[in-house]
Amino acid sequence: MSTFVLMELCKQSGVKNVIYQLLAPNITINLDEVEENRSYAVVIDKGIRYCLTGNPGIYDEEAPYVLLTDRTPTKQKLIDNDIRQRKWIKHPNQIEASPDGVINSWENRFHFKLEENEENPGLRKPQLGALHALLSHMLAPTEAATVVLPTGTGKTETMLSALVAGRCNRVLVTVPTNALRGQLFNKFKTLGVLKTPKFEIVDKEALYPIVGMITSAFEGADQLKNFIEQCNVVITTMQIIDSAPEEQQNVFVSSFSNVFVDEAHHIVATSWRKFSDRFPRHQLVQFTATPFRNDGQRLDGKIIFNYPL
């Protein structure tokens, strides 16, 4: 059986500092039934019409999905993957969503599913345990919290689960390296496995978060504030925040309801103290594989969950 993968639908702005929202993931369609036209082709899969056209002004009006390609498609070109996809002309998920609209879409859309076996996937025991501890802490936080999850237990999916299940207003995620910043950006914008058909921990009706990634300095505090206000989640390095002018640091401090510090054990005590002194302590949650820093000092903050190896 031949198939073709249709590109994702997303909104993206910015070059160095990027804001991204995934509106719909890739769609894999079956090529068994294809209608060819002089300007376009229509693939019919499970009764749904997917139109691919080389001309943005000529397409099947009845098709709910219309995709612009670099040339007139044919069934053989689709089978050979000899077509470049340009952009979506028409898609059921082409919507305008504000950060508040995204949060509202998460209400009652999270399922606390424990993984039973490969046929019944869900959150693992350490993930579900940490999530319950986080949600309990977030109801009435009074101090910084620490979640200890050993490597391989699914720390990132725990953060994603807390974001959606806790309906966090706006989250700052700090990481120690540029590489990890990019990895987490890719995870947060897709919600990892949470919305995949295999897991269905988050309902398909829930919108993907609007995620910002800061990789370079802003010209001024107003530009930074405008960037943050467009996002549900902002991911950056502690170094970016530390090197920002004081006025911009104040914007970071005042703009977020929650601050997730990933790989906290990699941060030396002096850097952590400088960072944590800026933010209200109750907003801070450290995620770490060990309660001890690489410099040998113990992490501060209340350990709300510690999963043993």
Residue ranges and their predicted role:
Residues 216-259, 266-274:
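Conserved RecA-like ASCE ATPase "motif II neighborhood" in helicase/translocase motors
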Residues 258, 266-309:
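Post-DEXD/H (motif II) to motif III coupling segment of the RecA-like Helicase ATP-binding lobe
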